Structures are given as structure tokens and as C-alpha cells.
Regions:
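Structural motif
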Residues: 2, 86-87
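Catalytic core of DAGKc-family lipid kinases
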Residues: 9, 30-46, 50-82, 91-98, ...
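N-terminal amphipathic/basic leader segments beginning at the initiator methionine
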Residues: 1-24
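Short amphipathic alpha-helical segments
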Residues: 17-18, 101-103
């Protein structure tokens, strides 16, 4: 298995990682901005292409062209069979995790395993909504151990109107902050 550890932001860069990680074969550690931009994450495509040179699954365009697409129901493990598994572990905020997921989604490469170590800004006393939603440990050492060795559990990926992955939470508001009238539709079901 190849493991990419993405240290997003100063607080994540200051986290002390086990010495064994620095010497482990197949583990690469990257220091990135607190919320990495598309250009900061280009290297992810190099890794996904190397480990899965040809993706046998239909592209988004091919799926959209089909007259009937099966309902997906519950999330499942990705069907792709890479040369070796790839686990990407994000150390950082919910926004950093969203940025990484967005990059993978836009590259049509959502097959790697994703781990998350919530690293919050102590000065702002932030809490990771993603960690709370997924019952992840908030202690960085425990979260890192789970991210490195835990069992993969597929979860749905939610994106906003701008095509960005939402990790944690999002709000729906009017541009001016006023009352909002409308409805939320997921597939064929009206939620609100």
C-alpha cells in the first residue's frame, strides 16, 4: 500500500509524527497550505495515474450518456483495482479535507482510500464537524493510528452548487442573509 500524508497548514506541520513513518517504505509526507488549491494537489493525479493507468469504469460523461443509470443506493467500495492500494491521509481542517476530495472528484479519481486527522486551530477553538459526523477520534495520535490502520468504510460524497466536496457541514443561505424560500431535492426526493 502507498500512503500519502498531507499536512495542511501550520498546526498540521507542527504535529509530531511517529519516527517510523518517516522511514517507512511506501509513505510520502507533503506539507501544504491550510486549504490547498488545485495546483498544490497536482501530484495526486501523478499517484492515481501511476497506480491505476487505465480506469475500466465508465467516466462521468459515459454515465450521463446512458439512457438509464442504476440507482446507487448505499455507498460501496470503489470497483477499481489499482496496482496497489493508495491511502491519502489529510491532516488539517474540514476545509482541507474538502479541497482534497474536490480535487480527486474533479479528476474522476475517487477510488483511493481517504483518512482524516482533524487538526484544529487552538487559538480559535475550532471543532471538526467531519470528525464528529464520522465519529473520528479528536486526539491526533489516535486519529492518525485509525487513518493508517483502520478499515475503510464508504460514505456518500456531497457537493455544493459550485461543485466542491463538502466535508463537515455547509449552510444554505440567501446572498444577502435574508429569509430563503425554496426546496432541496436529492435525486427524486424532496427533502425540504
Amino acid at each position: 500500500m502507498r500512503v500519502l500524508i498531507l499536512r495542511c497548514g501550520q498546526a498540521a506541520a507542527e504535529l509530531v509524527l511517529p519516527a517510523t513513518l518517516h522511514r517507512s517504505a511506501g509513505v510520502e509526507i507533503f506539507s501544504l497550505p491550510a486549504v490547498p488549491a488545485r495546483g498544490d494537489l497536482k501530484f495526486l493525479s501523478d499517484h492515481t495515474t501511476e497506480l491505476l493507468p487505465v480506469d475500466p469504469t465508465p467516466s462521468l460523461e459515459e454515465i450521463q450518456a446512458q439512457p438509464r443509470v442504476e440507482h446507487q443506493a448505499a455507498p460501496q467500495l470503489a470497483p477499481q483495482q489499482p496496482v496497489m492500494p493508495l491511502r491519502i491521509i489529510v491532516l488539517g481542517s474540514d476545509a482541507a479535507l474538502s479541497a482534497v476530495l474536490t480535487r480527486l472528484m474533479r479528476a474522476d479519481a475517487l477510488w483511493p482510500q481517504i483518512g482524516f486527522v482533524p487538526v484544529t486551530d487552538a487559538a480559535r477553538d475550532d471543532e471538526s464537524t467531519a470528525a464528529r459526523n464520522w465519529s473520528l477520534p479528536t486526539d491526533p495520535a489516535a486519529a492518525l493510528k485509525l487513518a493508517l490502520t483502520g478499515e475503510v468504510k464508504p460514505v456518500p460524497l456531497i457537493r455544493n452548487d459550485a461543485g466542491q466536496a463538502v466535508a463537515g457541514s455547509a449552510t444554505i443561505t440567501q446572498w444577502d442573509g435574508g429569509a430563503m424560500t425554496g426546496e432541496i431535492i436529492v435525486d427524486d426526493a424532496t427533502l425540504v
